[in-house]
From Swiss-Prot:
Domain ABC transporter: from-to ranges: 4-234
InterPro entries, per the entry: AAA+_ATPase, ABC_transporter-like_ATP-bd, ABC_transporter-like_CS, ABC_transpr_MalK-like, ABC_transpr_MalK/UgpC-like, Mo/tungstate-bd_C_term_dom, NA-bd_OB-fold, P-loop_NTPase
Name of the molecule in the record: Maltose/maltodextrin import ATP-binding protein MalK
Lineage: superkingdom: Bacteria
Cross-referenced PROSITE patterns: ABC_TRANSPORTER_1, ABC_TRANSPORTER_2, MALK
Species assigned in the record: Escherichia coli O6:H1 (strain CFT073 / ATCC 700928 / UPEC)
Length: 371
C-alpha cells in the first residue's frame, strides 16, 4: 500500500488547461473515486498518476517519493482500463501472468500469485479458458486479476464497468467493494456514474471543468454540497432548483421569498454570513426530501406533466406556473395521479439548500444522519 499526494498539479495542452491546481491527499488503503461529467479531467488525472500523461506543473508523490519523472513501470501502480484488453489466443491464466513473465518472474512465483488472485476473484475454475468463452463480467475480473498479480502499491481503475450491462455493473460493483475490503489496497477509481461513486468510495473527488469542486465522504457530498454543481451532480434524480429572493436575515437563518403568486416566505436554517437582503439566490431541494402537502406548512402547487411509475417508487414531474420549470417529486411506493392534474407538495425548510449567485452554498445547519 502507498499514499498518493498531488500538490498544485496542472495539465495543459498548449493553451488548453484540462486540470488546474489539483491538490489531493489519498491515504494508504483508501478507496477514492474521481467522478464528474465527460470532459471534466478525471481520466487525465488518473493517467498522470499512472505516468501515462506528463504533468505540466506541480508535484506528484506516491508514498514518500516524487514521481513526476519516474517511468510508469517504476511507480508501483497497476491500471485497469474500460476495455478488457485481453489476448484472445491466451488462456485466463496466461493473460493474468503475462506481465510477470515479461518481468522475468520465476515460474513458481507466477503460479502462486495467479492461483491466489484467481481464488479471490472466483476465477480458479476458468484458468484454462480463452476470453471468448467468458462473460463480460468474467473478462473484467480477468483484467483486474492481471493487475493484481503484479502486486501494485496503488490500484487504478478507469471506468472499468462502462462496457457491462446494468445487472453485471451491480454485480461487479459489489465484487470490487469486497475486493478492496479483503486486500486493503489503495484504490483510485474513475467513473461518470455517481451511483458507483456513492456506493464504492471511502472518499469522493468531484471534478468540474478541470478543477476539484469538492472532496468528501459520500453522505457529506449528498447532504452538504459545496456548490450548485456538486448539488446537481450528486443524487438521482438530480436536485430541484428554485429562484428565490432574500427578504431578511438573522443569526443562522435566511428568509427567502418563493416564486409563487402568494409570495410565500420561508426561513431556512443556513449560515447567513455574506447574504444580503434583496439578493437573488437559488433554493435547492432533493426530490426525495419533498413532502406530501398534508404534512407540510410550505406548499408548492403545479400541474403534473409526467408520472414515472417504478414499482418501488413514483417520480412525479410537476410544472410550477410562476417559474415555468418542472420540479421532480419522489415518493416511495405507488402514487396514483393523472397527467394534467393539479398536485401540491410540501417544502421542508430544514432539508433545503441555498446557493449564492456565484453557485457557492450557504452552509446548512440542520444535522443529517450519518454525517
Amino acid at each position: 500500500m502507498a499514499s498518493v499526494q498531488l500538490q498544485n498539479v496542472t495539465k495543459a495542452w498548449g493553451e488548453v488547461v484540462v486540470s488546474k491546481d489539483i491538490n489531493l491527499d489519498i491515504h494508504e488503503g483508501e478507496f477514492v473515486v474521481f467522478v464528474g461529467p465527460s470532459g471534466c479531467g478525471k481520466s487525465t488525472l488518473l493517467r498522470m498518476i499512472a505516468g501515462l500523461e506528463t504533468i505540466t506543473s506541480g508535484d506528484l508523490f506516491i508514498g514518500e517519493k516524487r514521481m513526476n519523472d519516474t517511468p510508469p513501470a517504476e511507480r508501483g501502480v497497476g491500471m485497469v482500463f474500460q476495455s478488457y484488453a485481453l489476448y484472445p489466443h491466451l488462456s485466463v491464466a496466461e493473460n493474468m501472468s503475462f506481465g510477470l513473465k515479461l518481468a522475468g518472474a520465476k515460474k513458481e512465483v507466477i503460479n502462486q500469485r495467479v492461483n491466489q488472485v484467481a481464488e479471490v476473484l472466483q476465477l480458479a475454475h476458468l484458468l484454462d479458458r480463452k476470453p471468448k468463452a467468458l462473460s463480460g463480467g468474467q473478462r473484467q475480473r480477468v483484467a483486474i486479476g492481471r493487475t493484481l498479480v503484479a502486486e501494485p502499491s496503488v490500484f487504478l481503475l478507469d471506468e472499468p464497468l462502462s462496457n457491462l450491462d446494468a445487472a453485471l455493473r451491480v454485480q461487479m460493483r459489489i465484487e470490487i467493494s469486497r475486493l478492496h475490503k479483503r486486500l486493503g489496497r489503495t484504490m483510485i477509481y474513475v467513473t461518470h456514474d455517481q451511483v458507483e461513486a456513492m456506493t464504492l468510495a471511502d472518499k469522493i473527488v468531484v471534478l468540474d471543468a478541470g478543477r476539484v469542486a469538492q472532496v468528501g465522504k459520500p453522505l457529506e457530498l449528498y447532504h452538504y454540497p459545496a456548490d450548485r454543481f456538486v448539488a446537481g451532480f450528486i443524487g438521482s434524480p438530480k436536485m430541484n432548483f428554485l429562484p428565490v429572493k432574500v427578504t431578511s436575515t438573522a443569526i443562522d437563518q435566511v428568509q427567502v421569498e418563493l416564486p409563487m403568486p402568494n409570495r410565500q416566505q420561508v426561513w431556512l436554517p443556513v449560515e447567513s454570513r455574506d447574504v444580503q437582503v434583496g439578493a437573488n439566490m437559488s433554493l435547492g431541494i432533493r426530490p426525495e426530501h419533498l413532502l406530501p402537502s398534508d404534512i407540510a406548512d410550505v406548499i408548492l402547487e403545479g400541474e403534473v406533466q409526467v408520472v414515472e411509475q417504478l414499482g418501488n417508487e413514483t417520480q412525479i414531474h410537476i410544472q410550477i406556473p410562476s417559474i415555468r420549470q418542472n420540479l421532480v417529486y419522489r415518493q416511495n411506493d405507488v402514487v396514483l395521479v393523472e397527467e394534467g392534474a393539479t398536485f401540491a407538495i410540501g417544502l421542508p425548510p430544514e432539508r433545503c439548500h441555498l446557493f449564492r449567485e456565484d453557485g457557492t452554498a450557504c452552509r446548512r445547519l440542520h444535522k443529517e444522519p450519518g454525517v
